Amino acid sequence: MEWRDEGVILGTRRHGETSAIVEVMTCGHGRHMGMVRGGRSRRMQPLLQPGNHVDVSWWARLDEHMGTFTIEPLSFAAARLIETPVALYGIQLAAAHLRLLPERDPHRGLYETLRLIIEHFDDPLAAGELLLRFEVMMLEELGFGLDLKECAATGRKDDLIYVSPTSGRAVCREAGAPWAEKLLSLPSFVNDTALRASCYDDLDRAFTMTGYFLMRHVWEPRAQTPPDSRSGFLNAVGRAINLSQAS
């Protein structure tokens, strides 16, 4: 059994004296584990860092075996990612989300969004927006997609500013006004890819919304808590935006 694909390194752990078990999010084969012989060598360690874009070949005698990887560099991002808290927490958060999915289950859209996130870590607001969309996609891929295109009460497709915590459906301003305190906020950029998050408050409200549904449908049923990297990422984005506005 063998295949070749491109991927992003998510994590590495020691295996024996010289080898490493490497976790890669691939384009066509999902999140995949494999052993890299000599993975702890000085030559290989810089390559096997989270965030790096790699060419990966996998081989195993049987499909159910972990198998071995042969990994070659396509682009190095890890050195840049460890320079800022936004990038460091961001790649950790993306990896934590991807580990909610079954291993070897292909998710090309998530892979492509992961690549975009890594490319935009130098813009905290853009990185936050992309990771928010990543969480919305995660809910969809896990079977808990949100319906944010029209009002659950009226069918209107404009002025959607709330989300029902019960149904996960959008609610327009007029229909939601009497129950505003019980509804989740829906910033306009979440629904319209042509719009950008205008400030940190937009991101914070959007992440509160996705966090509610991740907790309800994913973390709590699995007896899990939100990853520390999630709050770390949001705090880092907030600090970076404040610093840029002050300068």
UniProtKB/Swiss-Prot annotation:
Protein name (database record): DNA repair protein RecO
Disulfide bonds: none
Family stated for the protein in its record: Belongs to the RecO family.
Pfam families: RecO_C, RecO_N
GO BP terms in the entry: DNA recombination; double-strand break repair
Function of the protein: Involved in DNA repair and RecF pathway recombination.
A GO cellular-component term linked to this record: bacterial nucleoid
PANTHER family tied to this protein: DNA REPAIR PROTEIN RECO
NCBIfam families from the UniProt entry: reco
Swiss-Prot/TrEMBL keywords: DNA damage, DNA recombination, DNA repair
Species of provenance: Brucella melitensis biotype 1 (strain ATCC 23456 / CCUG 17765 / NCTC 10094 / 16M)
Origin: domain of life: Bacteria
HAMAP family xrefs: RecO
